[in-house]
Swiss-Prot record:
Annotated source species: Bos taurus (Bovine)
Name listed for the protein in its UniProt record: Casein kinase I isoform alpha
Record EC number: 2.7.11.1
Keyword Transferase set for record: yes
GO MF entries: ATP binding; protein kinase activity; protein serine kinase activity; protein serine/threonine kinase activity
Uppermost EC category: transferase
Length: 325
């Protein structure tokens, strides 16, 4: 990293985490690889300028604390202020599903999609049990772990998450119809496009679009051109509403259309039947005679890349293996 002013050269946060290099961007801040100088352990650090117009890292850190201990939720090491930044130190994770999709030439086998679907449904269900909805379900926000957690899927980036019911009374937030679209238009639910307050059903519908994105390589409402962001969102919304689920899922097992139709049929306050949705895909998985052995498409590719690297003096591996946050 250059030592010009404004760089993070010799930037130590929380007294012991030394920033190494930028590895990504979240919804509201940059993410850095850092090293714990007391034991050499690598961690991830999310930085947000204290001058940010809509600071949300403190909010996100509180959310992670509420979610701590859940499977596939990164562990928070430290939150505080350093120089002009709000700082969140957390577990270092592996590549996102978007990174891995690109690494696999934007093709996932049905086996990989179904193994992912199982973990993704469980991650979202856990967040919902803690009285929050994520509101930005997309491939970029699901990351694989590293080391002994390399087959475990993690859900990250809770900057847009919202409490949908009271912890004590279990009172659900009220239905509203004047909301701006929160999240990523490509994966947004139809109701989110229509300005309806989001609830559990919307996270689940978004996941349905993510799964079909992996199946199809792209969604019919991708690549639409428009003069303004607002017009683009309008076009995406129109295309989404005019594409029947059966057309979207044509050529793929009926379970994907069943999943989406189920999610779209949920009422605003209704709890999704997560087990039913997992079972849809688990039974399909068994019908297709797959083994749940955590051998994903990238597992094979990485092994091949590692073998090639080993035979060519061991230099090429990093270039071929997705890294980063």
């Amino acid at each position: 990293m250059a030592s010009s002013s404004g760089s993070k050269a010799e930037f130590i946060v929380g007294g012991k985490y030394k920033l190494v290099r930028k590895i990504g961007s979240g919804s509201f801040g940059d993410i850095y690889l850092a090293i714990n100088i007391t034991n050499g352990e690598e961690v991830a650090v999310k930085l947000e300028s204290q001058k940010a117009r809509h600071p949300q890292l403190l909010y996100e850190s509180k959310l992670y604390k509420i979610l701590q201990g859940g499977v596939g939720i990164p562990h928070i090491r430290w939150y505080g202020q350093e120089k002009d930044y709000n700082v969140l130190v957390m577990d270092l994770l592996g590549p996102s599903l978007e990174d891995l999709f690109n690494f696999c030439s934007r093709r996932f086998t049905m086996k990989t999609v179904l193994m992912l679907a199982d973990q993704m449904i469980s991650r979202i269900e856990y967040v919902h049990t803690k009285n929050f909805i994520h509101r930005d379900i997309k491939p970029d926000n699901f990351l694989m772990g590293i080391g002994r957690h390399c087959n475990k899927l993690f859900l990250i980036d809770f900057g847009l998450a919202k409490k949908y019911r009271d912890n004590r009374t279990r009172q659900h937030i009220p239905y509203r119809e004047d909301k701006n679209l929160t999240g990523t238009a490509r994966y947004a639910s139809i109701n989110a496009h229509l300005g309806i307050e989001q609830s559990r059903r919307d996270d689940m519908e978004s996941l349905g679009y993510v799964l079909m994105y992996f199946n199809r390589t792209s969604l019919p409402w991708q690549g639409l051109k428009a003069a303004t962001k607002k017009q683009k969102y309008e076009k995406i919304s129109e295309k989404k509403m005019s594409t029947p689920v059966e057309v979207l899922c044509k050529g793929f097992p009926a379970e994907f259309a069943m999943y989406l139709n189920y999610c779209r049929g949920l009422r605003f306050e209704e709890a999704p039947d997560y087990m039913y949705l997992r079972q849809l895909f688990r039974i399909l998985f068994r019908t297709l005679n797959h083994q749940y052995d955590y051998t994903f498409d990238w597992t094979m590719l990485k092994q091949k890349a590692a073998q090639q690297a080993a035979s060519s003096s061991g230099q090429g591996q990093q270039a071929q293996t997705p890294t980063g946050f």
